[in-house]
Design a protein with these regions (language model features):
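Conserved beta-loop-beta element that borders a ligand/cofactor-binding pocket
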Residues: 118-119, 154-178
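NAD(P)H-binding glycine-rich loop region in Rossmannoid oxidoreductase-like domains
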Residues: 32-97, 101
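Glycine-rich "substrate-gating" loop/helix at the edge of Rossmann-like oxidoreductase active sites
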Residues: 143-148, 173-181, 202-210
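C-terminal amphipathic/interface module of NAD(P)-dependent oxidoreductases
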Residues: 50, 254, 271-303
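Mid/C-terminal beta-alpha module of Rossmann-like enzyme folds, strongest
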Residues: 2, 15-18, 216-272
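Alpha-helical substrate-binding/gating segment
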Residues: 188-198, 202-238
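Conserved Rossmann-fold NAD(P)-dependent oxidoreductase catalytic core, especially the SDR/UDP-sugar
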Residues: 79, 83-145
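N-terminal Rossmann NAD(P)H-binding glycine-rich loop of SDR-like oxidoreductase domains
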Residues: 3-25
Length: 303
């Protein structure tokens, strides 16, 4: 299949391009500068330097690419986790406005299928249950989580409200692996090493992770599977009180500190408390069944 990948230089970009090429697809990777374009070409993809906010340029690029499938991995995320609030507005604009241009161009140029990045970590399910693909995003969570969930909700509504193209929403877990926050030497790992990421309260908030290489495999499988929503998360949704100490041991870091919800709220805000105590984990049963997908176990739980 001829595939156009937007956001080809993000965390999932390199493994996604590699997996597409491995499976025999012809790939055009969209990026924003010459250096990143050269990296894509070294991987074996065609490169397209594009401002996704320029609707005419986006349509011209899609027309030239003659893509059957379009994969939207557009994000604007910071290197440091503490900078997330500063990036939130730009990230939303990129996904809503830039992604809107991409979707309209894909339809105008006759693409058959559109794959959209979504969230498998801000879902809402009943306590002690895992969210499935029918579960909503938690738009009534803490302020930052709620805003992010609202963005993903709008993206999914836009995609599935359109009958002119086959839509697939990929609800990824928290990415880990090379070039992610959870890779040794990167933001989340550094915070754990410095004991700056404590277990909060009971630590019952359940996080779902996925290795970027497994996310890439699932994404490519979704190009030819039944349209719809897929949770691309691993087999180990885990409470903060379990995964965080395990991650510290994996890194060779000191045991995480333990603080109360009130202390966390004062130090880091409502989002930190919500993520540590109220997140819902997600089930990957549908993806395993329909995509033939078999993600690795969460690495640091095995360490």
């Amino acid at each position: 299949m001829r595939v156009f990948v937007a956001g080809a230089s993000g965390a999932i970009g390199e493994p996604l391009i590699a997996e597409l090429l491995k499976r025999g697809h012809s790939v055009v990777g969209m990026t924003t500068n010459e250096a990143r374009a050269r990296n894509l070409e070294r991987q074996g993809a065609e490169a397209c330097i594009l401002n996704v906010f320029d609707a005419e340029a986006v349509e011209a690029a899609l027309s030239k690419a003659s893509a059957e499938g379009v994969i939207d991995e557009l994000t604007s995320l910071p290197k440091e986790l503490r900078d997330m609030p500063k990036y939130a507005a730009a990230d939303r604009k990129l996904r809503i406005e830039g992604g809107g241009n991409l979707l309209r161009a894909a339809i105008a140029c006759g693409a058959r299928r559109y794959l959209q990045q979504s969230s498998g970590f801000f879902l809402k399910s009943a306590k002690a249950t895992l969210a499935d693909e029918s579960s909503p995003l938690d738009v009534n969570a803490s302020p930052g989580v709620s805003a992010s969930a609202q963005t993903y909700t709008e993206l999914e509504a836009r995609l599935f409200g359109c009958n002119a193209i086959e839509g697939v929403s990929l609800r990824y877990g928290f990415f880990y692996g090379p070039k992610t926050w959870y890779y040794p030497g990167e933001a989340a790992a550094n915070m754990v090493t410095k004991q700056q990421n404590p277990v909060v309260g009971n630590g019952e908030g359940v996080s779902s992770f996925v290795h970027v290489e497994d996310a890439a495999v699932g994404t490519v499988a979704a190009l030819s599977a039944e349209p719809g929503v897929y949770n691309l998360v691993d087999d180990d949704p885990s409470p903060q009180a379990v995964w965080l100490p395990a991650f510290a041991r994996f890194l060779g870091a000191p045991e995480p500190l333990h603080i109360s919800e009130a202390e966390a709220r004062e130090m880091a805000g409502e989002d930190a408390v919500y993520c540590a105590t109220q997140l819902s984990g997600a089930s990957n049963a549908k993806a395993k069944r329909l995509l033939g997908w078999n993600p690795r176990r969460l690495v640091w739980l095995k360490a």
